[in-house]
């Protein structure tokens, strides 16, 4: 496997794993995401689509893989921002609120999750922190592999 193919594979598998972990923690683990958690998911979804397309469009594979790496890095940057909010380094851009429910009964049953509250951590690092580390690290690896393959 050449380095561009490895980069493409990482660009697909890393966001699949991270987004899968987020969805699994929500639907299987009972952790309710805050607004910034959702913000981090969208770039991963875009990266999955871009990297998946790279497997089917070989003439555009390098560009699509690079764009997937950029999307992964964007999720990582949002993760850095979110982790900083959780640690009290800075304030978030918005107040995390529950979604707009149609009735009072629905509103009372929607979990309110604050963006500055850590719901889960491992080794003292929150999910947002792990997303930042893994996303930025994998984006750097993908970019490095693409650069070395070109050289």
Which residues fall in each region the model found?
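Hydrophobic alpha-helical segments of small multi-pass membrane proteins
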Residues: 41, 51, 65-79, 95-103, ...
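C-terminal TM-helix exit segments that contain a strictly Trp-centered aromatic cap at the helix terminus
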Residues: 20-26, 74-89
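Interfacial segments of alpha-helical transmembrane regions
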Residues: 2-13, 56-76, 139-146
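Extracytosolic (periplasmic/ER-lumenal) interhelical loops and adjacent juxtamembrane/interface segments
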Residues: 87-128
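Membrane-interface loop-to-helix entry segments
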Residues: 36-46, 118-137
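Alpha-helical transmembrane segments of multipass membrane proteins
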Residues: 20-24, 52, 118, 143
């Amino acid at each position: 496997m050449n380095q561009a193919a490895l980069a493409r594979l990482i660009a697909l598998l890393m966001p699949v794993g991270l987004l899968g972990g987020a969805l699994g923690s929500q639907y299987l683990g009972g952790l309710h995401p805050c607004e910034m958690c959702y913000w981090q998911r969208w770039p991963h979804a875009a990266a999955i689509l871009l990297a998946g397309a790279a497997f089917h469009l070989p003439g555009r594979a390098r560009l699509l893989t690079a764009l997937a790496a950029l999307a992964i890095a964007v999720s990582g940057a949002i993760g850095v921002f979110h982790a900083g909010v959780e640690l009290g380094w800075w304030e978030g851009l918005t107040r995390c609120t529950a979604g707009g429910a149609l009735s009072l009964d629905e509103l009372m049953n929607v979990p309110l999750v604050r963006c500055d509250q850590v719901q889960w951590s491992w080794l003292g690092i929150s999910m947002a922190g792990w997303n930042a580390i893994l996303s930025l690290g994998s984006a750097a690896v993908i970019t490095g592999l693409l650069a070395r393959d070109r050289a």
